[in-house]
């Protein structure tokens, strides 16, 4: 039975999360000496590299001193919140990565709050301590205050801190003492983060993410909650609505380094990919063939805004892209639905070539539009609209909740700014000082 640790990495945009994972992969001797490692290994999607953001959550695993560390890279942007919550369910602990100059930022707070609510044990990494004007000790205090304000438990507040520079490839318990590698961080992970609990019994696995392969179609990814799954085993899928379906696993894959490796059997606590299932959604449970028991499903954030997608009917039709017809665009949007969770697509009433596409926010939809454009699709998009809902016969509009933390002297300016946009102040409190 292999020793396993499942960790999620939480960080603000540009604090060096993907660089840190690169260095962890190198420490796990993932690349042969003559192999070109490259940087930003995880952000392998062109758009992610250009914008410097992680859009899709990814899984990699590192073997270190006989322990398998499954690293789950989470998107830091709240537009991809649908990705974050599902992914945290697979982890037993998290690495909170903060910049030694900037400290914890609003997006860090968003993901950290979700992680603490689930009960993950944090390890704090203060990165970029080699930069001038950095203030590692103050940042440590800020992280502690942030966790305290997010109602962390005593055990969570007793977190280890690692200082270092992912760019230069070192981590150490003291930011003044530079070491030659990042093994201190890997040792801290193995000591601090609990191993997954081994639960005996019939198999249960919650599908928390999707992978897609052009050869085998959709692949279900998740963490085995209880029991073991075997290749070729007959199973039952319990859908979110409670309906059941009998089917069979064609292949089981575990994550090894950057890729998958086929295996015969996976035990509870490990993260695996199941190949050969056809009809499944995120939030479904894979369980025993004869005695299916479903796990509680995951809630996914509802879309907040929509845009109209339609074919290009301007005089420049067909000049830029090669897929211009409504059939092409319709097929592409339906394909996107298979792996993009927080997205909704519906035909506009009475139309055959107009779709209303709803998503989490402007960034979420702009990434989809840009991806489609690069793939050679040609389309027109309308202005973003907020989504109205009818609840008990009353038309309701979405309301954003805004929390602002500022020094006292700026508070009047903030109130002025928000009230101009028809904001309504619910509470104001002074903290500290």
Q: What kind of feature is each model-predicted range?
A:
Residues 30-57, 80, 146-159, 190-203, ...:
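Active-site phosphate-binding and catalytic loops of NTP-dependent enzymes
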Residues 103-119, 140-143:
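Amphipathic helical hotspot of TIR/SEFIR-family domains
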Residues 121, 131-191:
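Canonical P-loop GTPase G-domain recognition
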Residues 1-98, 102-104, 138, 142, ...:
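P-loop NTPase switch module centered on the Walker A-proximal segment
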Residues 167, 182-221, 225-229:
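Accessory interdomain/linker segments of ATP-dependent helicases and helicase-like nucleic-acid enzymes
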Residues 8-9, 125-133, 174-178, 207-209, ...:
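Conserved short loop/turn motifs at secondary-structure junctions
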Residues 14, 20, 52, 71-73, ...:
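Residue-level signature of catalytic and energy-coupling elements of molecular machines
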Residues 140, 160, 184-191, 220-433:
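Accessory interaction regions appended to the cores of large information-processing enzymes
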